């Protein structure tokens, strides 16, 4: 049995445990500070350094330099709380922390994350709390507090600092700077604001009286220790959630009298008989999160004002107490409008830095949310057909965008431009202009939670039959609108249903294209067609004739063949000469380098060849016969080849590939094949 325990115990990092439980004298702590002044950082400095410890990545988007902070990818938890597609709001948030870290004024403000429901506000707050907790365990994030020990007049052997105060607060403010300089500590780097909390101040005064003012003897009763922040242990990380007015009072934030200890100390004004366990005190040295902050009773807001502006709180029956913590809250639009319209809350508005956290407006980033939640490792025994999550994400993003004012631009095209796709007639400047004219995009629309709920419904539905596809999910999304509590207006429901129709049309175009490519994915046939085209283009540009391989006769270049290919990618008659010369110049440049031309390296030509081959082969495959009950053996074999290509090249399974082929076949049967 002992060997099994030893095996289990071997996973415990004893060295790390000892580092986290380090304790020493006040003199040893001064030496720690002298060597590493960063241990005395305030909460905002530590928060900023924590985020920056994960690095920063610059990139250009629509001619604008943006910064991505990998911290918000949640690398420590393998992306469990990763925030996608919100680099601009997160840049603003980090800039607030940076400004506060440098003491430029934002450290005296409440940070308010504002946005629609399900836009990652609470996730961001949770990440910051988790990040601080993890950072405090690392050598570079170390911070310290202290206990009183061996007190000559106390009932307890050890009395911790009730709010985990900074040990340098023990040096009186009046001569702290001179004392630190005398100890060889750089006071330009170590700037400790604030004084002792009421409990420690009381003990300090009693000891000073006891030792006749000899500070050196008083400080012998101090044991400095490493401080590890922990939300679960309520150390340096606090969370406050509003309740109904009858069941909450300000003591939840600022602490309350411990009536049991009054019997020990004889007075309720003795700070040792006070529980410094309000959320503000718990969060000292770290962060406090206010969930749905603007639902707080007005009485609580006065505590919030002092805590943010002065970094002080007022416990019942005691003097103001210094605190050092990041104050962050979050709220939705409805509650924020109450703040804006309430003249009694002007003081809070004035002390608030609002950061809008919108929904994602980039399709690829929205898709990542659902790909993470419904990955193959999580979803067992049910196949999610290709484009299912993409179409759900497309609908969600489209509901958040403003309709384009330009007549020739559709909502789906606008969505594609935002996603980085290039469209004829639109440049990066066009995208910049679109965004400028739609500044409120992302502040309304469908929440990712609604999409996730409906995907979950589909996965457990009897209709799934081992596979869910875009139509099944889009129909589920449509049906859910009738009872969606956040979509109350019929106008919005009608608009969202119209967008579902647009997304279905987009999906139809995608699968038609995939089936076309699967049919024309015969490498040998494509290579032959390409060689034939190049021979004719070469003869045309060099004003030569082409030798017919079968008759041996020299003939004029096959203009009909060349135009049938070029027409597939909208090369106008007036531009055909330029296009053909470009192709030949490219082939010539490759030849100089000793390389041969591969049509797959030219995306436009590759697409044109595939479409031409599809046009030539679709009648021989007779895909439209799929919707009939009788399919001859030869046709079935060809269809099976196409199906296997769909499975191999696009990620379908047997069921979803058959469904897509049936769907596209029904379109061809209607004579609606994409040209």
Task: Write out the residue ranges for each language-model feature.
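N-terminal accessory segments that target, anchor, or regulate ATP-driven/P-loop NTPase machines
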Residues: 1-54
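Conserved ASCE/P-loop NTPase catalytic core
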Residues: 37-675
């Amino acid at each position: 049995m002992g060997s099994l325990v030893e095996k289990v115990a071997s996973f415990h990092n004893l060295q790390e445990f000892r580092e986290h439980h380090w304790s020493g004298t006040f003199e040893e702590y001064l030496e720690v500070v002298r060597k590493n002044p960063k241990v005395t950082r305030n909460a905002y400095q530590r928060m900023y350094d924590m985020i920056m410890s994960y690095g920063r990545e610059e990139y250009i988007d629509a001619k604008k330099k943006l910064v991505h902070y990998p911290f918000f990818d949640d690398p420590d938890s393998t992306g469990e709380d990763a925030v996608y597609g919100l680099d601009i709001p997160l840049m603003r948030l980090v800039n607030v922390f940076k400004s506060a870290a440098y003491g430029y004024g934002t450290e005296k403000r409440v940070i308010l994350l504002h946005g629609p429901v399900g836009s990652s506000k609470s996730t961001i707050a949770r990440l910051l709390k988790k990040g601080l907790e993890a950072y405090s365990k690392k050598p570079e994030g170390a911070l310290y507090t202290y206990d009183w020990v061996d007190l000559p007049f106390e009932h307890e052997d050890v009395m911790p600092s009730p709010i985990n105060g900074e040990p340098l607060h023990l040096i009186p403010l009046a001569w702290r700077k001179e004392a630190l300089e005398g100890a060889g500590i750089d006071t330009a780097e170590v700037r400790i604001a604030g004084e002792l909390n009421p409990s420690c101040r009381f003990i300090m005064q009693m000891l000073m009286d006891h030792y006749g003012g000899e500070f050196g003897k008083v400080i012998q009763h101090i044991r400095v220790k490493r401080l590890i922040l922990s939300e679960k242990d309520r150390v340096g990380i606090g969370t406050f959630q509003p309740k109904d007015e009858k069941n909450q009072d300000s003591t939840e934030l600022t602490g309350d009298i411990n009536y049991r200890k009054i019997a020990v100390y004889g007075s309720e004004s003795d700070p040792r008989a006070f529980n410094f366990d309000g959320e503000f005190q718990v969060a000292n040295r770290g962060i406090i999160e206010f969930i749905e902050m603007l639902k707080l009773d007005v009485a609580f807001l006065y505590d919030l004002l002092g805590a943010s502006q002065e970094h002080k709180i007022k416990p019942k029956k005691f003097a103001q107490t210094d605190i050092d913590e990041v104050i962050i809250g979050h709220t939705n639009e409805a509650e924020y409008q109450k703040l804006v319209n309430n003249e009694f809350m002007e003081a809070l508005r004035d002390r608030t830095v609002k950061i809008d956290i919108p929904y994602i407006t980039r399709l690829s980033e929205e898709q990542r949310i659902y790909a993470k939640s419904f990955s193959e490792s999580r979803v067992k025994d049910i196949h999610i057909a290709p484009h299912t999550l993409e179409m759900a994400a497309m609908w969600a993003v489209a509901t958040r965008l403003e309709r384009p004012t330009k007549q020739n631009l559709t909502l789906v095209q606008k969505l594609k431009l935002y996603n980085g796709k290039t469209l004829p007639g639109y440049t990066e400047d066009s995208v910049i202009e679109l965004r400028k004219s739609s500044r409120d995009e992302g502040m309304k629309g469908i929440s990712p939670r609604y999409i996730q709920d409906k995907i979950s419904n589909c996965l457990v539905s009897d209709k799934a039959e081992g596979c869910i596809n875009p139509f099944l999910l889009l129909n589920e999304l449509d049906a859910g609108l009738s009872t969606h509590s956040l979509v109350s207006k019929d106008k919005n429901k009608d608009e969202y249903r119209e967008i579902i129709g647009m997304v279905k049309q987009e999906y139809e175009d995608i699968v038609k294209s995939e089936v076309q490519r699967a049919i024309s994915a015969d490498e040998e046939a494509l290579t032959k067609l390409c060689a034939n085209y190049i021979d004719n283009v070469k003869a045309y540009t060099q004003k030569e004739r082409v030798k017919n391989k079968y008759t041996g006769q020299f003939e004029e270049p096959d203009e009909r063949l060349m135009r049938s290919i070029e027409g597939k990618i909208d090369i106008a008659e007036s531009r055909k000469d330029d296009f053909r010369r470009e192709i030949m110049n490219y082939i010539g440049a490759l030849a100089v380098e000793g390389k041969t031309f591969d049509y797959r390296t030219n995306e436009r030509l590759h697409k044109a060849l595939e479409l031409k081959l599809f046009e030539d082969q679709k009648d021989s495959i007779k895909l439209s016969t799929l919707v009939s009950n009788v399919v001859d053996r030869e046709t079935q074999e060809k269809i099976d080849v196409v199906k296997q290509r769909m499975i191999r090249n696009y990620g379908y399974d047997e069921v979803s590939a058959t469904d897509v082929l049936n769907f596209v076949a029904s379109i061809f049967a209607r004579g609606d094949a994409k040209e």
